[in-house]
Every structure is written in C-alpha cells, then in structure tokens.
Amino acid sequence: MLVVEDCPHLEQARRDLESSLRTGIIETPIQLIFVSSLDDAEFLGFQGSPTIRVNGDDVVPQPALPVGLACRVYRDTDGGTIGSPPIESIRAAIDSHRRARLEEFQREEAAKVAEFARAADTAESSSESERKSSEG
C-alpha cells in the first residue's frame, strides 16, 4: 500500500485490505510505503494516496490519472466518490492473483508428474531391453 503521510483514508484502506486478505489460507503481510517526494512518486508511478497494489498491479488501474503527491478519489459501486479503493476491487485483485498463482503451481506440478512418468517409462524400457538381451 502506497500512501502520503497523514493520508485521511489510510486506516479505511488498511482495514479493507486486511479484511480482503483474511479470506485466504495464507497470512499475507502488508507493506506500507510512505511516498514523500515527487521524485519518489514518479519513480513508483504513484497516482495518489492511498494506492493499493497486489503483486505490483494497482487494484483500480487508472492510466490517465497523473502521478503526484495527492489524495486519490475512487468510485464506489453506486458511482459516488470515496477516498479508498472499493473493497470489491481489492478482493477481485487478490482473487485474480491467487488464481494466477494456483494455475502456475498446477502447471509446474503437471510438468513434474509428466517428467517423472517419462523417466519411469525410460527406466522400464531399459530394464525390458536388458532382460531380452540376457535371454537371447
């Protein structure tokens, strides 16, 4: 979570993020970064406080929003303005990240199983060839 010092919406954003993270099995730490200069804001692509990112991705991407040291305004589900990311956006970003990680894990495990099966087939073929050659 990226914020400017004295951000009036920090606590609400933190509560919503903590609540969203508790829906998972694994405890995930929250990294709080205070952005204190325009140089830092530009380096981080900081578009206002508070900004929540999951695995580096903004939970409410707004490419047209300028970089700077300012409060950030969000839209709620009714179209009104709020001072922190909507909890639905936070949860959706976390769920998307978890699904992507799970799919990556499943692909890696499937590759390991396939490699193990190939190695077992190779070993079995080698043993069978040796047996036939000793019989012949």
Where are these regions (language model features)?
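Non-globular targeting/processing and membrane-anchoring segments
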Residues: L2-Q47, T51-G136
